[in-house]
Every structure is written in structure tokens, then in C-alpha cells.
């Protein structure tokens, strides 16, 4: 089961990065580092939080909220 959860987390990270890039118009390669260093990514990869059970749109929204809070 652990391998399936890790696979899901990795797939969701990729899908979320694509979603963020599409929304922002940024190159996905530019989004990767920023997303992977974010608190949202850390929470995504913590299986206890259950964030990995959500879809990429939800995770992208969480990331965008995190960025907005840090910018203010």
C-alpha cells in the first residue's frame, strides 16, 4: 500500500504543477522548484495529512492560497 500512496503523491505533484503552470501561464519547469519547496508540497508528501487524497485542482488552490498569504 505504501508504494501506491507514494505513486499517488508523485502523480498528484506532477498534475498540480501542470495545473499551476496552466493557470499562471508559466513554464512548468519554472513551477517545479517553487512548488516542491512550498509548504503545500511538504503537506502533500506527508501521508498523515491526507492532502494526497484530493485532486490536483484542490492542491493547486492550496498552493495559491499559501503564495497569497506569503505575499501579503
Functional labels for PLM-detected ranges:
Residues 1-72:
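C-terminal alpha-helical interaction appendages
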Amino acid at each position: 500500500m505504501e508504494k501506491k500512496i507514494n505513486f499517488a503523491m508523485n502523480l498528484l505533484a506532477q498534475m498540480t504543477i501542470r495545473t499551476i503552470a496552466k493557470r499562471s501561464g508559466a513554464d512548468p519547469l519554472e513551477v517545479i522548484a517553487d512548488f516542491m519547496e512550498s509548504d503545500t508540497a511538504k503537506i502533500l508528501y506527508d501521508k498523515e495529512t491526507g492532502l494526497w487524497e484530493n485532486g490536483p485542482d484542490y492542491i493547486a488552490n492550496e498552493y495559491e492560497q499559501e503564495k497569497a498569504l506569503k505575499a501579503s
